[in-house]
């Protein structure tokens, strides 16, 4: 498997919007604050043409233009890593406008995003044999202060952290809105983990394997299409085992 180079001090972070852009609040201000914060940390910024667009349906622009932006940004030497501007609804429509053969042959580059970005993170891994990061989108880096999860995402991107642990709780209702675009996560719910071996509950579970997965809504759409190379991927790495992570949006 190929791994991108970690983001160095002075390196350039590229932002793309293959799903929603940051054209409305609270995402616009969050995105602008994220750029400011990352520049303060010593990085340069490169913006794709769709970052502030809202012309598309369920995505920032037309599928053709979103696909063009994503492909050109990944192949370009102008950025060292890529972070998506947001999730959305119809990123699946851009896939026919992305040349995954060229991406597979290109120098690997870290791509970070979640939700609708499964259409890139999952395919980079299973189709292009390139590691990706299922993590926060651009506006989250504008929250003040950073939650440990945001700090960890940055440290993973820079290669300064290779081992991650869970967090004490999770957000059920966000306080972020148009008037409070940089609110941090509103942690109110306790973390509870359950592990099972078949129908039997296991108290102390250990497992190992390659992490693959993403948003189930996106994975369902990819199943059985020409982009579905999961069988080949799992066969190639079957000795390693697999740990699936699954996010449920509307399913």
Task: Enumerate the predicted regions with their spans.
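ATP/NTP phosphate-donor binding region
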Residues: 1-78
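Internal helical hairpin/lid segments
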Residues: 224-251
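Conserved anion/nucleotide-ligand pocket segment
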Residues: 131-217
């Amino acid at each position: 498997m190929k791994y991108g180079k970690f983001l160095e001090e002075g390196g350039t972070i590229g932002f793309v919007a293959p799903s929603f852009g940051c054209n409305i609040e609270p995402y616009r201000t969050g995105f602008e604050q994220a750029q400011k914060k990352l520049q303060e940390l010593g990085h340069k910024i490169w913006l794709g043409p769709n970052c502030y667009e809202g012309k598309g349906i369920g995505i920032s622009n037309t599928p053709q233009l979103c696909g063009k932006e994503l492909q050109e940004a990944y192949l370009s030497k102008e950025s060292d890593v890529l972070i998506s501007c947001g999730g959305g609804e119809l990123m699946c429509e851009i896939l026919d406008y992305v040349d995954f053969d060229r991406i597979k042959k290109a120098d690997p580059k870290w791509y970070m995003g979640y939700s609708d970005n499964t259409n890139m993170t999952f395919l980079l891994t299973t189709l292009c044999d390139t590691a990706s990061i299922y993590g926060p989108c651009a506006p989250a880096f504008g929250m003040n202060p950073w939650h440990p999860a945001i700090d960890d995402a940055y440290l993973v991107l820079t290669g300064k952290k290779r081992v991650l642990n869970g967090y004490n709780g999770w957000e059920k209702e966000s306080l972020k809105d148009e008037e409070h675009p940089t609110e941090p996560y509103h942690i109110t719910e306790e973390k509870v983990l359950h592990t099972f071996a078949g129908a039997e509950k296991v108290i102390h579970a250990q497992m190992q394997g390659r992490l693959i997965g993403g948003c189930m809504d996106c994975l369902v759409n990819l199943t059985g299409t020409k982009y579905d190379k999961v069988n080949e991927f799992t066969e190639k790495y079957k000795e390693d085992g697999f740990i699936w992570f699954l996010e449920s949006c509307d399913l």
